[in-house]
Swiss-Prot record:
Record Pfam families: zf-C2H2_jaz, zf-met
Matching InterPro entries: Matrin/U1-like-C_Znf_C2H2, ZMAT3, Znf_C2H2_jaz, Znf_C2H2_sf, Znf_C2H2_type
Name of the protein: Zinc finger matrin-type protein 3
Sequence segments annotated as region (Disordered): 182-203, 266-290
Subunit structure: Interacts with dsRNA.
Tissue spec. comment: Constitutively expressed in brain and testis. Also expressed in lung, kidney and spleen after whole body gamma irradiation.
PANTHER family: ZINC FINGER MATRIN-TYPE PROTEIN 3
Source species: Mus musculus
Stimuli inducing this protein: By DNA damage in a p53-dependent manner, and by methamphetamine (METH) in a catecholaminergic cell line.
Lineage: Eukaryota, Metazoa, Chordata, Craniata, Vertebrata
Superkingdom in the source lineage: Eukaryota
Chief localization: nucleus
Length: 290
């Protein structure tokens, strides 16, 4: 028992013994090396993130210029109100074009991502921005309806609600009134042109005097009547000139044929002149002479 106590008692004093200083120094040196490497790696990561953010910030600023509150230059759509703008920017067509825009302006992705990103760009149904020249147009044709496109205003819509809001807006109503006014003015000008041709052909057309083919009678004198052998009506006897042409002194209009001269006598111009002459003569008879 005594021997055991002597052996057991020195045992608690052993932990006070420390290892040599060289061993502690080695352990600390080995522990200090990995944090330095990790610290260098961690310091390089934020720099790479800032570069990526700087690269992504450029297309975002350009995108703000394309997507205005009332005009989407990316989709070439004019918006009339805030509700219509919200419906357009939340629509599928704008989302597809937005994805294509990011795919066209983003940094060159790795080989695996390029195959995935290239698929939506090459789809024939989605129109590609003019910056991307590698996309080929598809052979499928989609017919646009009133809910998709307004030919009068040259505007496309992403949903029927947006189309209905456009057709009820002020811009569409203004364009519609202008189109109707232009169509009415064109029809009025066409009718006026037809009336002018009729008047020129019937009332105001001067017929050239026909010369007599007989050389003996043509030299018979200045008062030779070419219609001497023809029967001249009594009511038109005072309207025939010595050269054989019918003449209206009131309207200062001449005609070579009896039919054309009678058409002039039945025209509105001649009748208005006659009524004006009668009114003047009546006023002169009554003593109202200016």
């Amino acid at each position: 028992m005594i021997l055991l106590q002597q052996v057991w008692l020195p045992l608690p004093n052993r932990p006070s013994t420390s290892p040599p200083m060289s061993v502690a120094a080695r352990s600390t040196r080995t522990l200090q090396l990995p944090p330095q490497k990790a610290f260098g790696q961690e310091a390089s990561l934020p720099l790479a993130g800032e570069e990526d953010l700087a690269k992504r910030g450029e297309p975002d600023s350009a995108l703000e210029e394309l997507c205005k509150p009332l005009f989407c230059k990316l989709c070439n759509v004019t918006l009339n109100s805030a509700q219509q703008a919200q419906a357009h920017y939340q629509g599928k067509n704008h989302g597809k074009k937005l994805r294509n825009y990011y795919a066209a302006n983003s940094c060159p992705p790795p080989a695996r991502v390029s195959s995935v990103v290239a698929e939506p760009v090459a789809t024939p149904l989605v129109p590609v921005p003019p910056q991307v020249g590698s996309c080929k147009p598809g052979g499928r044709v989609i017919l646009a309806t009133e809910n998709d496109y307004c030919k009068l205003c040259d505007a496309s819509f992403s949903s029927p609600a947006v189309a209905q809001a456009h057709y009820q807006g002020k811009n569409h109503a203004k364009r519609l009134r202008l189109a109707e006014a232009q169509s009415h003015s064109f029809s009025d000008s066409a009718e006026a042109g037809q009336r002018r041709t009729r008047k020129e052909g019937s009332e105001f057309k001067m017929v050239a005097t026909r010369r007599n083919m007989n050389p003996v009678q043509s030299n018979s004198g200045p008062y030779f009547n070419a219609r001497s052998r023809q029967r001249i009506p009594r009511d038109l006897a005072m309207c025939v000139t010595p050269s054989g042409q019918f003449y209206c002194s009131m309207c200062n209009v001449g005609a070579g044929e009896e039919v054309e001269f009678r058409q002039h006598l039945e025209s509105k111009q001649h009748k208005s002149k006659v009524s004006e002459q009668r009114y003047r003569s009546e006023m002169e008879n009554l003593g109202y002479v200016q």
